[in-house]
Amino acid sequence: LVGANDDNKGSTVVDLRAIAMDRLEARFDRLEDTHRNVIAAAYDNLAGTNQVHRAILRMMDATTFAQFLTDLSGEVADILRVDAIRLVLESSDPAGLTNTSKTVTLMPEGYVEGYITLGRNMPARQITLREVPTAGGSLYGERASYIKSEACLKVDLGPDRLPAMLVMGSEDPLQFTSHQGTDLLTFFAGVFERVVRRWLG
């Protein structure tokens, strides 16, 4: 009788059960996608945290300031997977601006603020992530044409010292973008400041 009744309904009858199942399956697929994205983001965040921690530990291993600078542009850069690291120090003596280190770059007073803000009348953020402006060429030397994105970390080296900046350059234009979080780099910058202050006494 049930079968006969179903046959008499014809093709114009809407199968509510099938529609409900289709909707449930679509919702389940969306939940699965969300779940996968959340797990992937968690793994990426954990990997980034471990990466920064390893870089900090390597940075703190140096027993001399010269070794610290060598490690910074060498193993620390490798751990962070960046293609260039430069420490920019300001000097109030323009006549003494000679750069002999591939890690440290001396610039005139006011350079850090102007570089981070691109000359705009605004306060410089502690962490700035962006595509490399054309003005960045002088910081990266012979690698300038390859660097496509950068992280600018404004560094406070203590009272009575001019501002400084640590820049990390990458050949990947998407490695540093303005919509990314900056918590890990803020932490790295804080440790970096303390380590450099220790060397500077």
Label each PLM-derived region with a short phrase.
Residues 1-4, 198-201:
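Signal-transducing coiled-coil/dimerization helices and immediately adjacent hinge/linker segments
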Residues 101-133:
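Acidic/proline- and glycine-rich, intrinsically disordered low-complexity segments
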Residues 170-187, 196-200:
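Regulatory loop-to-helix N-cap segments in sensory/regulatory domains
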Residues 62-101:
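Helix-loop-beta substructure at the N-terminus of cytosolic sensory domains
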Residues 148-157:
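A short, aliphatic-rich beta-strand micro-motif
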Residues 125-149:
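Signal-transducing coupling segments at domain and membrane junctions
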Residues 11-59:
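Signal-transmission linkers at sensory-effector interfaces
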Residues 159-170:
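Sensory beta-strand/linker motifs that couple input domains to effectors
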